[in-house]
A protein has these predicted regions:
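Positively charged n-region of N-terminal signal peptides that target proteins for export
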Residues: 1-4
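Sec-dependent signal peptide cleavage junction
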Residues: 20-32, 152
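Short, glycine- and small/hydrophobic-rich beta-strand elements in well-ordered beta-sheets
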Residues: 27-39, 68-98, 107
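Short amphipathic alpha-helical segments
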Residues: 52-77
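Short amphipathic alpha-helices in soluble, non-transmembrane regions
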Residues: 58-62, 112-121
Length: 155
């Protein structure tokens, strides 16, 4: 009997809150995670599905558009220092690597691709369409490297 009451109590603890009024609102109201960097320079790499490179480039165009239209002063600085390279040769699995180079890093600025797009695109259906395109294109994030400038050979 003690075992049964324990199981029922556990079920009530997990099931009842899931069906309570307003439960979904809790997740809708949470702020998205920011992607910030502390280094002077950032290098990020993403493997993109070979048949979805056009979709990924549309997402990047949306990012550029969002940052261009942003009234946040750091957005213009982000645009000036954010470059993206597409590897000319596919990986052995066929994926295409896109390298993001950010120099200089704008301290405390949000570098999340989707957060920046969502700040400009307010229509939930359009946000979902861009997210689905981004998720469908992304095979895997490969790495993020950030750190201080060690040497500038141009000087």
């Amino acid at each position: 009997m003690r075992r049964l009451s324990g199981v029922l109590l556990a079920c009530a603890m997990f099931v009842v809150p899931a069906f309570s009024h307003g439960h979904g609102d809790l997740f809708a109201q949470t702020a998205p995670n920011k992607t910030t960097f502390t280094g002077d320079i950032v290098v990020m790499a993403f493997a993109i599905n070979p048949d979805k490179t056009a979709d990924y480039e549309k997402v990047i165009a949306s990012l550029k558009d969002a940052l261009s239209k942003s009234e946040a002063p750091e957005a213009k600085q982000q645009l000036a220092g954010w470059k993206i390279i597409k590897n000319a040769m596919p990986n052995p699995d066929g994926s295409i690597v896109y390298i993001h180079i950010i120099s200089p890093v704008v301290k405390n600025a949000d570098y999340s691709i989707m957060n920046n797009i969502y700040a400009a695109v307010k229509d939930p259906a359009e946000q979902k369409a861009v997210f689905d395109m981004y998720r469908g294109a992304m095979k895997a994030p490969l790495f993020v490297i950030q750190g201080p400038m060690v040497a500038d050979l141009s000087k």
